[in-house]
Amino acid sequence: KCCMRPICMCPCC
């Protein structure tokens, strides 16, 4: 999931 990446550009963050 993108939220678990160092750089997040998703709505979930």
From Swiss-Prot:
Keywords for this protein: Disulfide bond, Hydroxylation, Secreted, Toxin
Tissue and organ distribution: Expressed by the venom duct.
Keyword Disulfide bond among record annotations: yes
Modified sites of kind 4-hydroxyproline: P11
Disulfide bonds: C2-C12, C3-C10, C8-C13
A molecular function GO annotation: toxin activity
GO cellular component: extracellular region
Subcellular location: Secreted
Sequence similarity: Belongs to the conotoxin M superfamily.
Domain-level remarks: The cysteine framework is III (CC-C-C-CC).
Protein name, entry field: Conotoxin Reg12g
Organism: Conus regius
Organism ancestry: Eukaryota, Metazoa, Spiralia, Lophotrochozoa, Mollusca
